[in-house]
Amino acid sequence: MEVKLADSWKDYEIIDSSLGMKLERWDDIYLLRPDPQVIWDRGDLLKRYPNIHACYYRSNKGGGHWENLRKTKEAWNIHYKNLTFHIKQMGFKHTGLFPEQAYNWNILRDKINNSKREVNFLNLFAYTGGASVAALS
């Protein structure tokens, strides 16, 4: 199996995961969010990491809410290579960016830069615009 990583991040990292939750660092902000792929038990992340800024709690009626545990910026910027993204806590556990997509952004940028011609680009997964920003860079 070939492992494909978005390994050029300096402002983002997955710190830990347990019991359906993923702890991430977004620049200097630590967020704990649900992740249905996390099926293992490494203990309660809220107890193990006192520096968490905010946690997203799902509702049994759908959706959920953020609870700020520490003073948290309303919005902030993170960088990936020469790209800058505006991040904030969104209504459905998201931050406005999917950092794991950076692997695809790299491929997209390489293909466009190596094409030696003008390229028209239609982004059919434009939920955040990350791929569009990468294509333009």
What name fits each language-model region?
Residues 8-27, 31-99, 106-109:
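Non-catalytic substrate-recognition/targeting regions of SAM-dependent transferases
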Residues 101, 105, 129-132:
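Hydrophobic alpha-helical segments
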